[in-house]
């Protein structure tokens, strides 16, 4: 199979990359791909954490993180919220960390207006749920009862939207059936979807309980797709393939930093610990994404929907050994029938379980790990009661993921040393930090 310059409709136009010489445009990318749309981006890791923008060759801005390499002069930093010039990068760091991400609706991913019927949700989904219950409305999905519910598509399938409301934990007992405004009923925090008179029984699987709230949050926080957009005017070669992958990885890194800020508990860690975790686990997160996208393919790796590598392309790019290692992970997760809920939770666990030696507050990081482990266990207990060991089996895949990540980092670091492939500041800096 040759490189696929697949058709991408106009809805994807906001994700089209720019040339490697203009990394400042990653600001647009992170605003699109970060779930809350509030994360900033730049050409280097420390400036990405702080909302600064640097050129491709600008030095790192965070002086207290020597593992990033080079302190460099303090540059003038423009605050996004005013026209004043901020001279101190540490001040900007604190500003960005204090800009907590907004709470998201667990049903569609829009900005939540508060907790409605037991769940963080937006006004639109609150009103939809209330109308459905009060009107005793039955819906039927025209497809397979698996429609994706997002802010943009939440009106496309009422049946799947209502099922999503129940799945994330909205409580039908909280809706007043008499349509009278006033005090709220007291109700138990549970869902008995199988007994609901408002659902077609064929649409519901009665044995399953609602998702763990952390898992639901991670599903909503999952970023939009990023496209590789390989240059169709350049002939296929190892340099073209590696340049495409390095550019893609750089843009994915920006998105990962924005995504991490939406993991419950991550933004409460110190800046130094956030940096340490990301510097340690970023490649594991990237590889896990490739693995998940590749589950429905045979012996091919889906680096992006428009960039799929088979064995011949892997050989051409000099990536055969690395890609074979990643395919072993694909095979393992495919045999386990990895679900999206497990994928997003494993990504967060991989970040929290990093092997960094530079953690300041070990107790806080341990607490984050415990919360995420419990979320996975709770999900498996509710969705896979037939396999009580499934959570443990999932966690046992992480050592192989880390081993594969180490191989990938070393391979791309060697490419960096050769100097034949252009790399953005952020990707280059993260390779340095990991090695």
Curated annotation (Swiss-Prot):
A single GO BP term for this record reads: regulation of DNA-templated transcription
Instruction: Describe PTMs of this protein.
Output: Acetylated by PCAF/KAT2 (in vitro).
Annotated NR LBD domain ranges read 210-434
Biased composition of type Low complexity is found at 34-47
Looking at the UniProt entry, the stretches that span the membrane are none
| Pfam family, any one | Hormone_recep
Record-level GO cellular component terms:
nucleoplasm
* GO MF annotations in UniProt: nuclear steroid receptor activity; sequence-specific double-stranded DNA binding; steroid binding; zinc ion binding
Summarize which parts of the chain are annotated to bind DNA, as ranges.
Answer: 102-177
Q: Where is the composition biased (Polar residues)?
A: 10-29
The annotated subunit structure for this chain is: Homodimer. Interacts with NRIP1, NCOA1 and NCOR2. Binds TLE1, PNRC1 and PNRC2. Binds GRIP1.
Q: What else is known?
A: No physiological activating ligand is known for this orphan receptor, but 4-hydroxytamoxifen and diethylstilbestrol act as inverse agonists and deactivate ESRRG.
How is this protein named in the record? Estrogen-related receptor gamma
